Amino acid sequence: MSKLTIVAKITAKKDSVENVKKELLKLIGPTRKEYGCIEYNLHQDNEDPAVFVFHETWENLVCLENHMKSDHFKNYVNAVDSLIEGKIVHKMTRIA
């Protein structure tokens, strides 16, 4: 099974940027310790601070699915549900 790359774009509401950032940062430590997590990096757009992007690499889809079932991920979803304008998640496989 191929490794899985995730690019997830989260857009915070303008009045919630710092709260969303705080919740996103809480994910880093526990997620990087998860089985199958190869890379889990958070970025913030230089021109629009309300835009955050995760670049993730997972051993496989099962590892990603387990991450999404974790308590820390569920806590994040509950905490930011009303604070974000939207999210776009791309699940990709490296081809070169």
Which residues are covered by each model-predicted region?
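Short, well-ordered beta-strand segments in beta-rich or mixed alpha/beta enzyme
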Residues: 4-10, 41-68
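N-terminal first-folded block
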Residues: 4-32
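Hydrophobic alpha-helical segments with strong N-terminal bias
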Residues: 20-23, 28, 44, 54, ...
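Glycine-rich beta-strand-turn "strand-cap" elements at beta-sheet edges
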Residues: 2, 41-48, 77-96
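A broad "ordered helical/assembly scaffold" signature
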Residues: 16, 40-41
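Extended aliphatic helical segments
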Residues: 7, 17-20, 51-53, 62, ...
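An amphipathic, aromatic/His-enriched active-site/gating alpha helix that lines ligand/cofactor pockets
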Residues: 26, 32-38, 57-90
